[in-house]
């Protein structure tokens, strides 16, 4: 602590950018910051079960080294001394990597995910691995290895998934930011439910390397590379200003994820926004109707832009109701994915046996991922002809949206039909992921942001979408709307 000035502030409420600046200026100690984050996580964990694995001792060692680097005037990375968490299934060499599966209960990561390696090189310190849905196959965080993660605003409600544990740690002030992954809303859905910012970057920007299907065993398989093209790793943050900094650090080709072809640099000045398209689609087929709170949030977002002189237009397409099935069709027809291969961790999956074991109280798999795998097998039975019309709808939407996204336009629409529902609700409403999942197969960047208000005690959110490679436009919009609506609100823990 010698040489470090002390400031009287709640460090846990600050952004990663602010914390890095204070550490660099010797205003706060990385050691003190890590201890405060650990203390907060020890408060939150018994209430929400957000953490899968604690990395406390390694983090303390890293913080001591980070403090020494500051005091001795050594070169510092952009996020030097700033703690973060990451999804358990991403992979941190030597740490557990069960992905929430009993079949992998003794598995440890043999390598560190590219995005985590880049954050470490920037000086950030991993504090914990976040709980997740089993094999990242469900929009709720509940598994047979680590248990269920609870929402910090109302513990009777879901934290979302699959990156639910990290979203809760960010929302409750345990870490300033986290790394998640998104193949069908797995960053954006928990971000929405926990009142934080979550970005699924443009296709081709951030490598998935380390996470299924680009893990140590599968990364070279053609099907793995094809599936990864519809996934992305990305940041979860309390403040919009952190999104771009983290994105700059983690973006760019690594030679493993063959879908990646570019990096990201924040532009020196914001591109003026000229048009905002407001979309309030009919409910996704077999999904939940939009709540009044979410509908009002989308409309009010448009109104705030109109007040700034931005042109605001309504936009929709009838095929948006098929969003879930478009997502499923693309994955089935263009990647040949079989979720049973992942749920069974490469071993054949016997559905009758798995269902019998679940009914007998001896489950092998979490209910949600097992249902997802069954639904996926139904898609196999439909075959390509049965799914072909959804591929045509994908092509139509891609063309229509590409015509809207001219580099100065964004789309505003729901991320979820309402606020976080009760635990287990996704079993009755799995199709609700369509609002987010659609943009995985379209490839456009999509960002979920909190509206600074609550409904039924839980955060309300909207989703922003821009053209391919126009991530900076989304980040600027997030900063504007954060100022307009207030952004993150501290949960009552």
Model-predicted segments: where are they?
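Glycine/threonine-rich flexible loop motifs
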Residues: 97-106, 291, 421-429
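Acyltransferase
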Residues: 30-35, 64, 290-316, 339-351, ...
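A short helix-breaking turn/cap at a secondary-structure junction
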Residues: 200-302, 485-493
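Acidic/His- and Gly-rich active-site-bordering loop/insert found
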Residues: 69-144
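An N-terminal boundary/leader segment
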Residues: 1-61, 307-309, 380, 490-493
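Short glycine/serine-rich loop segments
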Residues: 112-247, 440, 445-452, 458-461
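Short helix-loop capping/hinge segments that flank enzyme active sites or metal/cofactor-binding pockets
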Residues: 79-99, 272-281, 333-398, 402, ...
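Glycine-rich, small-residue loops and helix-cap segments
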Residues: 26, 81, 121, 125, ...
């Amino acid at each position: 602590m010698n040489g470090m000035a002390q400031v009287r502030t709640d460090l846990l409420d600050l952004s990663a950018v602010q914390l890095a600046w204070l550490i660099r200026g010797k205003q706060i100690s990385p050691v003190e910051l890590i201890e405060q984050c650990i203390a907060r996580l020890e408060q939150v964990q018994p209430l929400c079960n957000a953490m899968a694995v604690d990395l406390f001792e390694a983090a303390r060692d890293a913080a001591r080294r980070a403090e020494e680097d500051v005091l001795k005037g050594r070169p510092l990375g952009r996020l030097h001394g700033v703690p973060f968490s990451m999804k358990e299934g991403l992979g941190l060499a030597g740490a557990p990597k069960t992905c929430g599966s009993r079949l992998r209960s003794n598995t440890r990561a043999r390598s560190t995910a590219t995005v985590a390696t880049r954050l470490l090189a920037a000086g950030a310190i991993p504090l914990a691995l976040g709980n997740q849905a089993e094999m990242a196959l469900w929009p709720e965080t509940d598994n047979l290895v680590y248990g269920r993660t609870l929402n910090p605003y109302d513990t009777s409600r879901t934290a979302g998934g699959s990156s639910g544990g990290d979203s809760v740690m960010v929302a409750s002030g345990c870490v300033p930011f986290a790394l998640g992954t998104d193949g069908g809303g797995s960053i954006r859905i928990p971000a929405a439910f926990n009142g934080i910012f979550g970005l699924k970057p443009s296709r081709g920007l951030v490598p998935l390397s380390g996470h299924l299907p680009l893990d140590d065993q599968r990364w070279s398989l053609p099907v793995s590379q094809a599936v990864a093209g519809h996934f992305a790793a990305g940041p979860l943050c309390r403040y919009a200003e952190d999104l771009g900094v983290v994105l700059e650090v983690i973006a760019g080709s690594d030679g493993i994820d063959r879908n990646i072809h570019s990096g990201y640099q924040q532009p020196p000045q914001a591109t003026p926004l000229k048009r905002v398209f407001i979309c309030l689609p009919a409910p996704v087929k077999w999904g939940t109707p939009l709540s009044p709170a979410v509908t009002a949030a989308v409309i009010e977002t448009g109104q705030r832009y109109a007040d700034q002189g931005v042109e605001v237009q309504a936009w929709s397409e009838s095929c948006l109701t098929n969003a879930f099935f478009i997502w499923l069709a693309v994955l089935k027809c263009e990647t040949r994915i079989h979720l049973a291969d992942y749920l069974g961790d490469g071993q054949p999956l016997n559905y009758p046996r798995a269902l019998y074991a679940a009914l007998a109280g001896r489950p092998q798999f979490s209910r949600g991922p097992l249902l997802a795998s069954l639904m996926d097998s139904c898609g196999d039975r439909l075959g390509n002809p049965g799914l072909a019309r959804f591929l045509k709808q994908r092509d139509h939407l891609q063309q229509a949206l590409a015509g809207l996204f001219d580099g100065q336009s964004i789309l505003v629409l729901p991320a979820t039909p309402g606020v976080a529902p009760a635990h287990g609700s996704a079993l009755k409403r799995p199709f609700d992921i369509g609002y987010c999942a659609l943009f995985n197969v379209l490839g456009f960047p999509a960002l979920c942001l909190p509206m600074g208000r609550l409904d039924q005690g839980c955060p309300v959110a909207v989703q922003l979408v821009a053209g391919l490679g126009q991530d900076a436009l989304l980040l600027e919009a997030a900063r504007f709307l954060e100022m307009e609506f207030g952004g993150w609100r501290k949960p009552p823990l």
